[in-house]
């Protein structure tokens, strides 16, 4: 008689919210770098010595992100001036994402919010 055992191993991703939070923290401490002779060096001296290469565990970027608040046709950014905030049709239909859309589009770019109410009348061709 013999015995048999099977082992199965697999990798599993962590919980999405935990991974997202870890990425957000790394994003907030990301290092602007220059690529010199195959190495990445901090562009601005913060807590690191500019002569010391960036650590492999650091999140690094080579250039600043464009300002998406401003019109920039070169990169296809339409800016936020004059854009409509996303809203649901009824009070119960507004998600948290929709409720925060004005803040994302306007106030985070230094713009104010102008509220307008539009009433649309249409014929439904009803027959009684």
Curated annotation (Swiss-Prot):
One of its GO terms (molecular function) is frizzled binding. Keywords: Developmental protein, Disulfide bond, Extracellular matrix, Glycoprotein, Lipoprotein, Secreted, Wnt signaling pathway. Disulfide bonds join 69-109, 85-102. GO terms for biological process: canonical Wnt signaling pathway; cell fate commitment; neuron differentiation. InterPro entries: Wnt, Wnt_C. SMART domains: WNT1 (SM00097). The keyword Transmembrane helix does not apply. Palmitoleoylation is required for efficient binding to frizzled receptors. Depalmitoleoylation leads to Wnt signaling pathway inhibition. Proteolytic processing by tiki1 and tiki2 promotes oxidation and formation of large disulfide-bond oligomers, leading to inactivation of wnt8. Glycans are attached at residue 72. GO terms for cellular component: extracellular space. Belongs to the Wnt family. This is Protein Wnt-8.
């Amino acid at each position: 008689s013999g015995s048999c055992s099977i082992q199965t191993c697999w990798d599993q991703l962590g919980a999405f919210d935990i991974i997202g939070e870890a990425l957000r923290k790394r994003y907030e401490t990301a290092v602007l770098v220059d690529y010199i002779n195959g190495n990445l060096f901090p562009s601005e001296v913060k807590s690191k010595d500019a002569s010391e290469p960036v650590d492999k565990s650091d999140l690094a970027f080579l250039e600043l992100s464009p300002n998406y608040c401003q019109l920039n046709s070169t990169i296809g950014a339409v800016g936020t001036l004059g854009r409509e905030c996303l809203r649901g049709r009824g009070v119960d239909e507004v998600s948290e994402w929709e409720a925060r859309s004005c803040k994302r589009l306007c106030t985070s770019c230094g713009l104010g919010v102008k509220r307008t109410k539009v009433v649309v009348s249409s014929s439904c061709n009803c027959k009684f």
